[in-house]
C-alpha cells in the first residue's frame, strides 16, 4: 500500500510542471488550443480576431526613437514606460500577483532574429488558435489618455503609430490595426488620420475610452468627416482607470475591472447618440470594443425610454436610440460566460 502511494507521488512529481520556472513558449502554452482548432476544422473558414493585443512597452526603446521632440525623446529613453515612467499613473493588478504566467513568461520567450519579435509572437498564438487575421491594439497605452501631459500623449501616439506601421503592419499582411488617436488634442487627432489613413494594414482609428473629452465637441467634426470620406471606422476601445472619481469608491480591483470597461463606453455612446452624431455622419461606422455585450440591451431600453419622454432634447435624432445602436458594431472580451449547469438552464 505504502509502496503504491509512493509510486503515485513520484509520478505526480515527474508530471508536475512549474510554469513559473520553465522556458516559456506561446506554442507550448496553446498546445491544447492548437489541437482543438484542428478537431473543429478552423482551417475551413475565415477567423478574424478583431481585438488582439500586444505589449508595446517591450519595444518601447524602439518606439521612443520615433518621438519628434528631442527633449521628450531623451526623457522617454531615461524614464521608460514602466510604473513611474513617462505616462504611467499606478500599479498593475491584472496579472493577479504573477499567477497569470504569460505576463512575466513572454518576456523571456525565445524568438528568431527576424521577423520582428511581435510578429513572431502574434503568429504563434494565431496559428495555435486557428486565427487567420488579427487586429492589433496596444495594451498599456490604452491608459495613455490618463496622462496629465497632453504633449506626451501626442508625441507617444505619433511615435507608436509610426513604429507600428514601419515595423509590424508593413511586414505581415495578417496583422491589421486601428491606430491610436490622441483625443485630448483634436488637431493632432486630425493630423494622425491624414498621415496614416493610407498606410498598409491600417483599417481604421481608435479612441481609448478612459479619456474625459466630449466626443460631440465641434473640434472633432473634421476628423469624423475625414474618416467617413475614407470609409474608415472609428473605434472606442474600453479600458479602466482606478483614478476615475466614481471608480475610486471601489476598494477591490475586481469592481474596477468589472465596471470600468463597460461604464466608459456607456458614457461615450450616450453622448454620441444624444448629440446626433449618427445623423451628422450617417456613413461613419462606429465600433465599441472590449466593453462586453450585457450592457447593450440595457442602454437600448434606457435611452429609448428617455427619448420617448423628452424627444426635444435630442433634436437631431430621427429614430429611437436603439435603432442607431443596432447599426453599430461591438466586440466582447471575454465572452461573458455564465454558469451553464442544468439548474440554471432548465
Positions of PLM-derived features:
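Helix-coil boundary/capping segments in enzymes
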Residues: 1-346
